[in-house]
Structure formats: structure tokens, C-alpha cells
Design a protein with these regions (language model features):
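Conserved catalytic cysteine-centered active-site region
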Residues: 1, 36-80, 96, 106-117, ...
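Flexible, low-complexity linker/loop segments at domain and module junctions
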Residues: 1-7, 93-94
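Condensing-enzyme catalytic core mediating Claisen C-C bond formation in acyl metabolism
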Residues: 4-8, 28-38, 201-241
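Beta-strand segments within the central parallel beta-sheet cores of soluble alpha/beta enzyme folds
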Residues: 6, 96-101, 147-150, 172-180, ...
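Acidic, glycine-rich active-site loops and adjacent beta-strand->loop/helix elements
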Residues: 11-13, 103-106, 151-155, 179-184
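Short, well-ordered amphipathic alpha-helical segments that serve as non-catalytic structural scaffolds
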Residues: 77-89, 130-132, 224-226
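Phosphate/pyrophosphate-binding loops at sites that engage ATP/ADP/AMP, CoA/4′-phosphopantetheine
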Residues: 83-97, 139, 228-235
């Protein structure tokens, strides 16, 4: 398919906001979401991180998931961002729609707890990165194609590029693409072993910079061909170029 690829919806949840409006207000106010960990239990709680300021229980309540259901935090973050993007775009799942999510650890927060505290061994299925994407897709239903990209820091960007290719090839009309990732002990232990985590809020443009801070969140966009978007009366937010 020739023509431009446009963005018709976007959603985000991060350490500085739930949704685009709150995130923008925080950015304008120069609010930092980096601080001490409050929800992830780890020996490295003194390391500053960009943690979403909601517990798993609060995230579940926000999307109507039963409190006693075991759901990876990555899944919960992803659902919130995907919901905002799809609602803004005015789209639903269909045979011609795809969900492409980028993640590195998937449901590792759940499997870490299983290893340390014991529990239902069947939950180790959530260790698979693709399990979170499947759960996000199941929450909304109707996607003709569901796939996961796991290429470390480039995962979400590669998800968007794959989505554009699927539209250009004519395989899909609508793509929901992006990424979701929660903080885990694996992240902190791994990066800390490399000696690259700053014990203070990072300052990348300072001559005395001393490392980075980790964070969590989710962000997704809805992609369509410009022709498809205009045909259904959608207003493009931007162009993917």
C-alpha cells in the first residue's frame, strides 16, 4: 500500500503521569518522577528509579481487574496505555488489526516472587515475554495478529517499524504498537552489576555525570494508512516518517 502512515491515537503511563494530559502537565512543570522505590521490594531500594506511582492493586482497580487475580505489572501498565490509545483513535480489535508490543522481561516480576516465596508453578508461563502481550490482547479482544518484539532498548521502536511494514504490505489496516515494561529485581541487579547506576538522579549532560536511572512504564500508538484513517473520519495526530 502506498501513501503515508499516520498516528491516530496515543497512550502512556509513566513515573510522571497516567495518560498524556497528566504527563504533559508534569513535563511543563519540570516534575521529576525519579525517586526511591516504593512498590518494588528489593535490596537496592536506595537507588533512584522512575517508578509508576501506583501499586499493582491500584492498577488493577483502574482497569477493572479482580484484586485476587495474578497479573504481571507489565501487563497492567500495557493495558492502561493501549486503552488510552485505542479510545483516542476510536478503534477496536478486528481481523485486520494487530497488537505489537515490545518488552524485555515480560512477567518476570511474578516469577521472581514465585522463586522467592513459592507458589503456583504454572505461573512460570508468565516468564515468557509474549505472555504479557497475549494478556493485553485478550483484555481488548479481536486482534487478528498479536506479536512481541524483544530487542532490549529498541523493542518499542522496532514494534512501530514492524507495524508500519504490515500496513504498507496490506496485511493490516490498524496497528497498535509500542512497548511496556515494569521494574524488577532483575533490572536493578543486572544494571547494578555493570556499575552504571547513579546513586543520585542522573545528569546525562553534566561533566560529572555518573550513570543512569532505570524506569518503568508503557507507551503505545495507533497506526493506520492516511487513506484508511480519513475514510473512517479519524483526525491524524502525526505522520510516521
Amino acid at each position: 500500500m502506498s501513501g503515508r502512515i499516520v498516528i491516530t491515537g496515543a497512550g502512556i503511563i509513566s513515573a510522571i503521569g497516567v495518560g498524556k494530559e497528566e504527563t504533559l502537565r508534569s513535563l511543563v512543570a519540570r516534575k521529576s518522577g525519579v525517586g526511591r522505590l516504593r512498590h518494588l521490594q528489593t535490596a537496592h531500594s536506595d537507588l533512584p528509579c522512575g517508578e509508576v506511582n501506583m501499586s499493582d492493586e491500584e492498577l488493577k482497580n483502574a482497569i477493572g481487574v479482580p484484586a485476587d487475580r495474578i497479573v504481571p505489572r507489565t501487563t497492567l501498565l500495557g493495558i492502561i496505555a493501549v486503552r488510552e490509545a485505542m479510545e483516542e483513535a476510536g478503534v477496536k480489535g478486528s481481523d485486520r488489526a494487530a497488537l505489537i508490543s515490545g518488552t524485555t522481561v515480560g512477567g518476570m516480576d511474578v516469577t521472581e516472587r514465585c522463586c522467592l516465596q513459592g507458589g503456583d508453578q504454572s505461573l512460570f508461563r508468565l516468564h515468557d515475554c509474549g505472555s504479557c502481550t497475549d494478556e493485553i490482547a485478550d483484555f481488548f479482544g479481536g486482534f487478528g495478529l498479536v506479536t512481541t518484539i524483544s530487542t532490549a532498548c529498541s523493542s518499542a521502536a522496532n514494534s512501530i517499524m514492524l507495524g508500519a511494514d504490515l500496513i504498507k504490505s496490506g496485511r493490516c489496516d490498524v496497528i497498535v504498537a509500542g512497548g511496556a515494561e515494569c521494574l524488577t529485581r532483575y533490572h536493578l541487579n543486572g544494571f547494578n552489576s555493570l556499575k552504571i547506576l547513579d546513586s543520585e538522579p542522573c545528569r546525562p549532560f553534566d561533566a560529572t555525570r555518573n550513570g543512569l536511572n532505570l524506569g518503568e512504564g508503557a507507551g503505545f500508538v495507533v497506526l493506520e494508512s492516511e487513506e484508511h484513517a480519513l475514510k473512517r473520519g479519524a483526525v491524524p495526530l502525526g505522520i510516521l516518517d
